[in-house]
Amino acid sequence: MNDRVRSRTIVSAQSITLPKGGDVHLVPPPPKPCVTIVVHGVNDLAGCYERIERGLCQGLNERLDMPPTLPGGQANPGYLTPAGYSLPADDEGKAENPDVVYYRRKFASGAGGAAVRSVVVPFYWGFREEEQYINKTAAHGEWLDRNGNRLDKSGTKEGGQFVNATTNLPDMWGQGFNGKLFGFISLDWFGGTMTHPLFSAAGRKYMVLAAMRLAMLIKIIRKRYPDDTINVVGHSQGTLLTLLAHAFLKDDGVAPADGVIMLNSPYGLFEPLNEKLQGWSSQQTREARLATLKGILEFICGRRHPVPALSSVALRNCQGYGAIGGPGWVGGQGCQTTIDGERLSFDERDNRGSVYLYFTPQDQTVGLANVQGIGWRGIAEQVKGLPGRTGLPQGFHQRIFTVRKRNGEKEKIGGHAPPHVYPLLLAGEKTWEDTGLGGKDRFGRANFDQGDSVLLTAPRLPLPTEARFDFDGAVTAPGENSASGVYQVRDTLDPIDAAIGVSNGGWKEKDSGHAVAQQVDAALAYRYGRDARSVERALNEGKELAQQTHVFSARELGTGMVLVTRAETPYEARLRLQTAEGHLEPLSFHSAIPNNPEHNRRVLAYDLAIGAGDSVDDVVFYQYLCRVADWRLDWKASDKGIFSQGDASVDLPDEEVRALYRAEESKNSQLIDATVAYRKSGEFPVVVGNRLPSLVGTQTILDRYHEQAVRFGGTI
């Protein structure tokens, strides 16, 4: 069958055949408006995906005038409903193997038990340590890589180690973070924390593998449904994967995504001294960074796909099946919808061929002195005398999310008609004022210069909104009442970060500071003797390392019970670190944009490109895409051993999905299989070569010193 011509079931029901009765009236759901692939960053189990999907579905419903019920009172079959996710709140974060249990998307189970009707394809990627280098016997029970970084119990790290994030694309082919300043000073000693150690890390080519997989995912969609409207929403390092994936697509002759949205991107256009001190003459120049960004954005913005015309999928222009919106959505000027109970009008815009950058000056991660990413400062008109935003295509737009107040008012996202100049720093302001950062932490951050500004070119929104970064945690005094409006938020650790803390000094084997008094049956406690070491042996027998303890003393109570005073187990330490009493950590605001569902509802949903989403209407193909996008999943019943707290059956494809896998073109199958092999063994796929795609430019500062021009593509 031609890939362009496919039939599928739109709606179905069952009924008993009866004379003059038994009719079932079916209301077909309208087509979905788009496909949206979400890509996470480093050190990330994609905890923000649930909030992105929840906000996007609600926002798209409002944008398309798609209420939950129809005028007659029946449920609206076109209403988008997000998938549910397994979250720490489900069981108070008590799962013993948190990496396997939490932040897993439930494909068939929507939020609140409703049926899933979504446009989101969640993409997952990461690093796998080679088997022989995994330390599985540390006393705290956590697995470690060769450099002492925590891994999950399958030897992987979702998104790779936090320190391995890059500010450019060529570095993804390079060595990992070396952990040293000037080659010998420990950066962990200088700037590491319990949950974010600055240990050395493995080479970064697993990021190239992830970008190849993302490009393959888009290619698979394009082959089967060439007119689908595809968005890629990348967060943090996921934005660089998105850029690199498009460079691969260009060389493969495949059309780009229709819309790209980059959140909190660490992509840098400068040459920070702190970065130079780690890589010396191998640092990429601003010329290469700008040229690469310009070329990739021109590829995305220059291939605008006009099919379907938005007016052609509006209800008033569709005879029968085909409209993606409700009665108020007309696909152009004069759309109407209801938001917060009020009816309002807005002009629809065709976002195909657009790239949006969301940035925040309060991002303390990409605002680090060795990063200075565009997700912190946006893109200025000029960058050190070179064309910055002015050199990028017209389809590039940027929005600022800031909690800073000026003249007592907060900046409204989408509140200005473009273009609008936003000063990053006015007289009397300081870059990191009221953030709660101490002197040492401020020293490690970059600063704006007075007079720095960015041109905000993103269109107005139907309902301009304020940025709020306090969706999680508790705001510390004085909060929004500070002179600048900037505030600090402190929050408890999630189970993954708490486990990192356990592996990095948050638990000590013989620490009496968190001693536990426990009554134990004498027959158990004295099984091997009455001394402390014998009692310890009895208590630890047959238990995982994370459940073992050190016994300080044991005293018989005379009631058949023994009072054992012992140290907390690593597992108990993890649970302690997950509480406000155990540990509170200030948020860096690096995930503050996607972590607030209201940002996704009121901003992101309107910047997505819409038109057609047949691939996520095709139920089996949608399931297939979600499997291809998740590197943690296998295609055969061979992974049950690591899913001790999950239902392994949900991680295996059914026969229809497996048939799509078997029919996949050879090049894609090889990449899918190589990814599975890498996840299982750490053996890196040979399919990931050492050649840059043609849109990726490279020039080190040493190259520039020797007057060697920016080189595009070729061996690196």
Curated annotation (Swiss-Prot):
Gene Ontology cellular-component annotations: extracellular region; host cell periplasmic space
Regulation of protein activity: Neutralized by the immunity protein Tli3 in the periplasm of P.aeruginosa cells.
Region of interest (Disordered), residue spans: 68-87
Keywords: Host periplasm, Secreted, Virulence
Keyword Secreted: yes
A Pfam family per the record: Tle3
Task of the protein: Antibacterial effector. Is toxic once delivered in the periplasm of prey bacteria.
Self-association and partners: Interacts in the cytoplasm with the adapter protein Tla3. Interacts in the periplasm with the immunity protein Tli3.
Full protein name: Antibacterial effector protein Tle3
Organism name: Pseudomonas aeruginosa (strain ATCC 15692 / DSM 22644 / CIP 104116 / JCM 14847 / LMG 12228 / 1C / PRS 101 / PAO1)
Highest classification ranks of the organism: Bacteria, Pseudomonadati, Pseudomonadota, Gammaproteobacteria, Pseudomonadales
